[in-house]
Amino acid sequence: MEAGSRVIMQVLLLALVVQVTLSQHWSYGWLPGGKRSVGELEATIRMMGTGGVVSLPDEANAQIQERLRPYNIINDDSSHFDRKKRFPNN
């Protein structure tokens, strides 16, 4: 039985190695050999030429500030919380 399981493991390992060596990885926008197409490279360069600055509309900025406001109130007025003493006074 031990020899049978050993043969099965060797066949599985061989199948895995063959599958990995024969498979070709194709990523979106890449050609075989890891080369990019020229058209996609030009589009990427043009996109980077804009500076990459994205401004949020005023409405979105107001919504973000509204969501963060309760946290600012808690942080500013935290003096009413008493710290618990870890060790009693003797």
From Swiss-Prot:
It holds the Pfam family GnRH. GO terms for molecular function: gonadotropin hormone-releasing hormone activity; gonadotropin-releasing hormone receptor binding. Expressed only in the terminal nerve nucleus of the telencephalon. It comes from the Eukaryota. It is found in: Secreted. Disulfide bonds: none annotated. The modification Pyrrolidone carboxylic acid is found at Q24. Belongs to the GnRH family. This is Progonadoliberin-3.
